[in-house]
From Swiss-Prot:
Superkingdom of source: Eukaryota
Primary role: Adapter protein which non-covalently associates with activating receptors found on the surface of a variety of immune cells to mediate signaling and cell activation following ligand binding by the receptors. TYROBP is tyrosine-phosphorylated in the ITAM domain following ligand binding by the associated receptors which leads to activation of additional tyrosine kinases and subsequent cell activation. Also has an inhibitory role in some cells. Non-covalently associates with activating receptors of the CD300 family to mediate cell activation.
Organism: Macaca mulatta (Rhesus macaque)
TM helices/strands, residue ranges: 41-61
Similarity comment: family membership: Belongs to the TYROBP family.
Protein name from the UniProt record: TYRO protein tyrosine kinase-binding protein
Chain intervals for the UniProt region annotation (Disordered): 75-113
Positions where Phosphotyrosine occurs in the chain: 91, 102
Assembly, per entry: Homodimer; disulfide-linked. Homotrimer; disulfide-linked. Homotetramer; disulfide-linked. Homotrimers and homotetramers form when low levels of partner receptors are available and is competitive with assembly with interacting receptors. They may represent alternative oligomerization states or may be intermediates in the receptor assembly process. Binding of a metal cation aids in homooligomerization through coordination of the metal ion by the subunits of the oligomer. Interacts with TREM1. Interacts with TREM2. Interacts with CLECSF5. Interacts with CD300LB and CD300C2.
Protein's cellular compartments: Cell membrane
One of the record's GO cellular component terms: plasma membrane
Residues holding Ca(2+): 50
Record key words, sorted: Calcium, Cell membrane, Disulfide bond, Immunity, Membrane, Metal-binding, Phosphoprotein, Signal, Transmembrane, Transmembrane helix
């Protein structure tokens, strides 16, 4: 079974459920239970229907996502670059080493010596 494609494995599932000898799901105490039974074909149909619906939803989201424009055209990118170059930097330029900024810290805390 290692050489089968995933699609053929998926189609093999109902066959295995039907031929594999699975009995319908039944209650343990049949005498006083009015439960309905679920055949393997119905169970396989539910599972396959769920898988198909999940794949269809994923494909719909993928294709609808491709239809939405991203809004990053060439003209918009050029104006964005221009806006970035026009804005002023919020950072200060480095001014070299200044010893007077922290010189008073050593005199205030002598217990660190």
């Amino acid at each position: 079974m290692g050489g089968l494609e995933p699609c053929s494995r998926l189609l093999l599932l109902p066959l295995l459920l039907a031929v594999g000898g699975l009995r319908p799901v039944q209650a343990q105490a049949q005498s006083d239970c009015s439960c309905s039974t679920v055949s393997p074909g119905v169970l396989a149909g539910i599972v396959l229907g769920d898988l198909v619906l999940t794949v269809l939803i994923a494909l719909a989201v993928y294709f609808l996502g491709r239809l939405v424009p991203r809004g990053r055209g060439a003209a918009e990118a050029a104006t964005r670059k221009q806006r970035i170059t026009e804005t002023e930097s919020p950072y200060q330029e480095l001014q070299g080493q200044r010893s007077d900024v922290y010189s008073d810290l050593n005199t205030q805390r002598p217990y660190y010596k």
